[in-house]
């Protein structure tokens, strides 16, 4: 007869914090110590004689056992992490191997002084009598008093939202349970943010509770927590923990008092401390609304609406966001938002109209002004402790008061203030989008979730949420904020054409009058035009399309470009800006004494450069179609390219086309592929040969057979032929670039592999974004070719952008683009750049003055 330990596994956290919580790692990466299972016998089949417990686990005594195992305290202790806040405080076990447990509600937080009267700090109701309430984190007994107050005030139905995204544990304090949160030693005053993909805060709280219970068993039934982290006087406090009932998780604190009140419901709705909610978080909120008939406009709905109660730590930031959302819901329920507007005499400028994103929304949405005013009204009703509009304006004012040369580190740095200003504007803008959603979906009882509705309105994702002012910006300020540089320094000549053509990467599509090149100088432009119109090529008409979204000037024979953080601008605005920059750079620098010295002897805008050559080449036409670097072209970019091609070919089928960007690679190649597809549809397709057998690593991906691509192909009529034609166009254009060794289908997987191999987090993030942008570019070319096929009968009267909205979006294309990724290569965990919101905003906000241009 032998002894063996129980086969139940015990998991022990061992120092690696969970992903996203101010550190790296995942919940799955926690080290575990488990007992070996039986090799040949099991408890179920053996004849157990008796069970003798030891200090840690029961020992089961069985017949005919060959092995013996026991667990000892020392083994468990070896896999936990010890730490202390200072040399004067005792050492103790750390939550998740890193975090200290800190009491998160203090008397100073209760600005409204409502803990004694209502049970929770900063308990309040919105102005105007709507049944929307907000509060800070109550204790268990405090929450019971909140419920009593709501009942006493006659609220028969109530929906309570805890909007905290961080894990919260409640420890016994006399006859009550009070809240504590894990905090990092470096940020003891900040909650943990961002649990990472796939981590549910409720599950995390249960895991931490089990961990603290184990710590207490190893420390004479006590665990150390902190109340005052300022000077650590009298810290830490030892809390007695004899069992798991001495610790509560958030769900227990909120749900147990509601057990006997079936008309009162509780939901965990994690909202971010900074910035706007994610679409998934707003979807979760809408799901609760769908399940609450008294909040909907139903025929048999009667009686008052339920009370909506929102709670976070202090009852200020996230609570205020929840209260504004709840107020908008009740305004729609009461019909206040649907009252007809009086005829406007003179529309007053809105407080937030100074921001470009708000002006863009007002221009785009027919009832946009009314929707913004409703959000402003809701914010004002909830502004007793926190006015979101004022926060945005104050942050913007602070940002304007900081000099660019201020220190780069710390909470007062320009970058930190800029980030807070951007987050607050983003939060305000998403409230406007949510109100727009309510206007369309509230009468339909939320037929679409918020995320699906946004995919049906992709133009809203295109609105750049930046701090750019709606007014004109002085060239001097643009130069200060941006990066003025000489193009020659960052435009590599991969095709070695400078010696012959005076310009980098000049090339032609075989057997087609389609050319691509880097940015030419005035001299190089003359050489190219002479080449195109010589006796061999004899092009009478030449359409030149500049794809640069940067302001470009030629100064003293060299081209300079100005990149600045902010959204792209329209072609006419870009050319106006170039004229202003020319005037600014043509002035002598201020403060110079003696003879006048100018920055440059000659300074020309691109329009002026091309106008000069029009005398020698009367058939020259110049277009400016700004396209974003690295990314897929916008829907309107396809419209403008196709219109330029069709207009020229209708006048002269022999017209030649030249496309140029900074290096003549990424944007130029994409536009050349668009031109090839358009030529084929207008003048006839060549015979597409047999599919080439590819015998290389990742052959499937070299052929462009990514899972998300094939998903799109399956949706499109004759999708495989459509993709095959795009591949043929890519191959045709790529024949001109053989020395560059770049191909769109290949570079997608190549960049993905580089991201996986990157050592630095910032570089990995940049490459992850690039690989998805290249993948999106490929998908968009396939969609454009499908459009050319399907709309050919009507001579493409309906623009591609309209077709995408009216046809493709309804087929679910934007929903696919909103889940872009490589599921065949990595787990299905959601990555931020998989979503349209992050990819499209990134191309509006990011500025990489030192990065080389897109190499495709």
UniProtKB/Swiss-Prot annotation:
Question: Which Gene Ontology CC terms are recorded?
Answer: cytoplasm; cytosol; intracellular membrane-bounded organelle; nucleus
Lipid-acceptor residues (N-myristoyl glycine): 2
Annotated Low complexity bias: 1-16
Please list the tissues where expression of this protein has been recorded.
Expressed in endothelial cells, and in certain larger vessels, in mural cells. In the brain, possibly expressed in microglia. Expressed in peripheral blood mononuclear cells (at protein level).
> Which Cys pairs are S-S linked?
none
Q: Name one Pfam family in it.
A: PTPlike_phytase
UniProt-annotated stretches for the region Disordered: 1-29
Which InterPro entries does the record match to this protein?
A: Prot-tyrosine_phosphatase-like, PTP, Tyr_Pase_cat
Q: Which family does it belong to?
A: Belongs to the paladin family.
Protein name, UniProt field: Paladin
Q: To which species is this protein native?
A: Homo sapiens
């Amino acid at each position: 007869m032998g002894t063996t330990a129980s086969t139940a596994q015990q998991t022990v956290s061992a120092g690696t914090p969970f992903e996203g919580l101010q550190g790296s790692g995942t919940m799955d990466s926690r080290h575990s110590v488990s007992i070996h299972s039986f090799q040949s016998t099991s408890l179920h089949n053996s004849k157990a004689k008796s069970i003798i417990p030891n200090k840690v686990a029961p020992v089961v005594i069985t017949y005919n056992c060959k092995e013996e195992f026991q667990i000892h305290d020392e083994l468990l202790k070896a896999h936990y992490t010890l730490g202390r806040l200072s040399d004067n405080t005792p050492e103790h076990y750390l939550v998740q191997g890193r975090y200290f447990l800190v009491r998160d509600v203090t008397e100073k937080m209760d600005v409204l002084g409502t803990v004694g009267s209502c049970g929770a700090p900063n308990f309040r109701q919105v102005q105007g009598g709507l049944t929307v309430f907000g509060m800070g984190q109550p204790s268990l007994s405090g929450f019971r008093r909140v419920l009593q107050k709501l009942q006493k005030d006659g609220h028969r139905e109530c929906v309570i939202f805890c909007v905290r995204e961080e894990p919260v544990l409640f420890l016994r304090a006399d006859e009550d349970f009070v809240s504590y949160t894990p905090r990092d030693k470096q940020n003891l005053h900040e909650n943990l943010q961002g649990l990472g993909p796939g981590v549910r805060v409720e599950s995390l709280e249960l895991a931490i509770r089990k961990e603290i219970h184990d710590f207490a068993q190893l420390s004479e039934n006590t665990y150390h927590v902190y109340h005052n982290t300022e000077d650590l006087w009298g810290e830490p406090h030892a809390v007695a923990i004899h069992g798991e009932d001495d610790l509560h998780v958030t769900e227990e604190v909120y749900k147990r008092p509601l057990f006997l009140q079936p008309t009162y419901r509780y939901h965990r709705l994690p909202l971010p401390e900074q910035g706007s909610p994610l679409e998934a978080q707003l979807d979760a909120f809408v799901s609760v609304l769908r399940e609450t008939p008294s909040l909907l406009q139903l025929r048999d709905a009667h009686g008052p609406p339920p009370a909506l109660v929102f709670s976070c730590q202090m009852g200020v930031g996230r609570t205020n966001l929840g209260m504004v959302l709840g107020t908008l819901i009740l305004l729609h329920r009461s019909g206040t938002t649907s009252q007809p507007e009086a005829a406007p005499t003179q529309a007053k400028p809105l407080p937030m109209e100074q921001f470009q994103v708000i002006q863009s929304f007002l221009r785009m949405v027919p009832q946009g002004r009314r929707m913004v005013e409703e959000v402003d009204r809701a914010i004002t009703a909830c502004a007793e402790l926190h006015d979101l509009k004022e926060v945005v304006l104050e942050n913007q004012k602070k940002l304007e008061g900081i000099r660019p040369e201020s220190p780069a580190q710390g909470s007062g740095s320009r970058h930190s203030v800029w980030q807070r200003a951007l987050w607050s504007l983003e939060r305000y803008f998403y409230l406007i989008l949510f109100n727009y959603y309510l206007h369309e979906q509230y009468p339909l009882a939320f037929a679409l979730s918020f995320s699906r509705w946004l995919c049906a309105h992709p133009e809203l994702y295109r609105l750049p949420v930046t701090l750019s002012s709606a007014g004109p910006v002085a060239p001097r300020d643009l130069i200060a904020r941006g990066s003025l540089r000489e193009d020659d320094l960052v435009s590599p000549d991969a095709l070695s054409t400078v010696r012959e053509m005076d310009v980098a990467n000049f090339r032609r599509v075989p057997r087609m009058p389609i050319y691509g090149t880097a940015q030419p100088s005035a001299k190089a432009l003359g050489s190219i035009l002479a080449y195109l119109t010589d006796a061999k090529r004899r092009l009478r008409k030449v359409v030149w399309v500049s794809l640069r979204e940067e302001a470009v000037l030629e100064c003293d024979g060299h081209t300079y470009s100005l990149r600045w953080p902010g959204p792209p601008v329209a072609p006419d605005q870009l050319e106006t800006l170039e004229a202003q920059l020319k005037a600014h750079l043509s002035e002598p620098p201020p403060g110079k004494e003696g003879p006048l010295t100018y920055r440059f002897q000659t300074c020309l805008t691109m329009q002026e450069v091309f106008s000069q050559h029009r005398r020698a080449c009367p058939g020259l036409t110049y277009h400016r179609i700004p396209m974003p670097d690295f990314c897929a072209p916008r829907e309107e970019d396809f419209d403008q390219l196709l219109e330029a091609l069709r207009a020229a070919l209708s006048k002269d089928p022999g017209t030649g086309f030249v496309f140029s960007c900074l290096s003549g690679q990424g944007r130029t190649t994409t536009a050349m592929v668009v031109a090839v597809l358009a030529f084929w549809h207008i003048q006839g397709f060549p015979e597409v040969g047999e599919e080439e057998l590819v015998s290389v690593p990742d052959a499937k991906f070299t052929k462009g057979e990514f899972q998300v691509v094939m998903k799109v192909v399956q949706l499109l009529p004759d999708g495989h032929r459509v993709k095959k034609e795009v591949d043929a166009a890519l191959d045709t254009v790529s024949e001109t670039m053989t020395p560059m060794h770049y191909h769109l289908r290949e570079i997608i997987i190549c960049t993905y592999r580089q991201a996986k191999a990157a050592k630095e987090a910032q570089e990995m993030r940049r490459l992850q974004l690039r690989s998805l942008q290249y993948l999106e570019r490929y998908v968009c070319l396939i969609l454009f070719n499908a459009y050319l096929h399907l709309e050919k009968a009507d001579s493409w009267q309906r623009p591609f952008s309209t077709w995408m909205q009216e046809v493709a979006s309804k087929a679910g294309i934007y929903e696919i683009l909103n889940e872009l990724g490589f599921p065949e290569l990595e787990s299905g965990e959601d990555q931020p750049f998989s979503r349209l919101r992050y990819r499209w905003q990134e191309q509006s906000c990011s500025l990489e003055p030192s990065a080389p241009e897109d190499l495709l």
